[in-house]
Amino acid sequence: MKRIPEPFRIKMIEPIRMTTLEDRTRALEEAGYNPFLLKSEDVYIDLLTDSGTGAMSDRQWAGLMMGDEAYAGSRNFLNLEKAVKDVFGYEHTVPTHQGRGAEQILFPCLVARMKGDKPVFISNYHFDTTAAHVEMTGAKAINVVTEKAFDTGTYYDWKGDFDLEKLEATIRQHGAQNVAGIIVTITCNSAGGQPVSMANIREAAAIAKRHGITVIIDSARFCENAWFIKQREAGYADKSIREIIREMYSYGDVLTCSAKKDPIVNIGGLCCIKEDVDLFRAVQVRCVPMEGFVTYGGLAGRDMEALAIGLYEGTDEHFLTYRIKQVEYLGERLRQGGVPIQYPTGGHAVFIDAKLMLPHIPGNQFPAHALANEVYIEGGVRGVEIGSLLLGRDPATGLQKESPLELLRLAIPRRVYTNDHMDYIADTVIAVLDRASSIKGLEFTYEPPVLRHFTARLRPIA
């Protein structure tokens, strides 16, 4: 397929170095066969995450020099608040150190004000830290994504959509009084960075409104979702990205955002409320002891300024086209080489279907994690498992949850790697495919009780 050149000039570079096979084998063993525990200096191309790993623009770097580090009332906060109103149309802004900071101050407030005593949150698909914060409130995280998300080889425009019938049925099953919130994750990371259609967002929000349930939009990749709507959904081709974003957020009540993704900063998050003053004040109360004063929320003034600028830059259609087409290019190279992926590619990453690539490894031996290790050993490329290891155990029973997908995510940082890097990544993965049948599953030598995939240590099964 045709490659789109990078829509920027490179003003600064960071050298990276290739390591030897022996170096990588030793480094992975020392890391307990967990790519999260590798030293970055031992990684050649780092696709662990697109969160906080992007390259800021010259305007964002200039913004860092304009930091107002006042403890209260920083002008950078006022600029950020204005950007939130411009982009999302939400009145009330609470900055946080990153997305999970927004979740930890918001979710307990939503549980506290619900009428029932058996709280649940329903989402198209909770991401790992979101589900963990839900469970830390004593609530249950329930996913009702479309079944099409699990058919990785078949093209479908909206694999991130809610299954609306399941959404209605889940509300009836648990009772609306027990649903603390409906979380719309855009794009849907755990399903492969897949977009959610405007029609689906609109209908999910209408269902929530009929039942008096708060709608939270998990907004890490909201710009990418808007781009897909413009490209694929009838009636939106002539609308701007900013217009589409405004409509998406008109259907929500609250947003949480890891600003380390689409707004392209190294640190920062947002918890924003459209108009509910009581909820805003409750979130502010939790913010002070957990994140910091309400006008900095754990961020330096300079970082709020970079975030305010990034909210505008992330919505640029020319940038988004290059960004998503670069991901698509990598996906097509892999498909041409016989590697099974979640198809079509999503916005921020290529997701390799490890169930299909390593059918001999059962879910409880973590096939996608085993594949991640082999890709690192082959070429120094670091990815991350999205599957049984990430999903973890049922907190009530202690049993391993059954993951419907076993995916290796190759997340592409924004404005960092060129198309030549994409070719190298593809060649590395295709080389692993040639010896896939010899790859072994993994077992724990250390298993943390919460979010185990970050710090677990494992070993190959003999």
Curated annotation (Swiss-Prot):
Organism domain of life: Bacteria
Protein family (similarity comment): Belongs to the beta-eliminating lyase family.
GO molecular function: tryptophanase activity
EC code: 4.1.99.1
NCBIfam families (alphabetical): PRK13238.1 (NF009709)
N6-(pyridoxal phosphate)lysine modification, residue list: 261
Pathway: Amino-acid degradation; L-tryptophan degradation via pyruvate pathway; indole and pyruvate from L-tryptophan: step 1/1
UniProt subunit comment: Homotetramer.
PANTHER family noted in UniProt: BETA-ELIMINATING LYASE-LIKE PROTEIN-RELATED (PTHR32325), TRYPTOPHANASE (PTHR32325:SF4)
CDD domains on file: Tnase_like (cd00617)
Reactions this protein catalyses: L-tryptophan + H2O = indole + pyruvate + NH4(+)
Listed name of the protein: Tryptophanase
Organism: Nitratidesulfovibrio vulgaris (strain ATCC 29579 / DSM 644 / CCUG 34227 / NCIMB 8303 / VKM B-1760 / Hildenborough) (Desulfovibrio vulgaris)
Keywords of the record: Lyase, Pyridoxal phosphate, Tryptophan catabolism
HAMAP family, sorted: Tryptophanase
InterPro entries: ArAA_b-elim_lyase/Thr_aldolase (IPR001597), Beta-eliminating_lyase (IPR011166), PyrdxlP-dep_Trfase (IPR015424), PyrdxlP-dep_Trfase_major (IPR015421), PyrdxlP-dep_Trfase_small (IPR015422), TNase (IPR013440)
Record has Lyase as a keyword: yes
Cofactor: pyridoxal 5'-phosphate
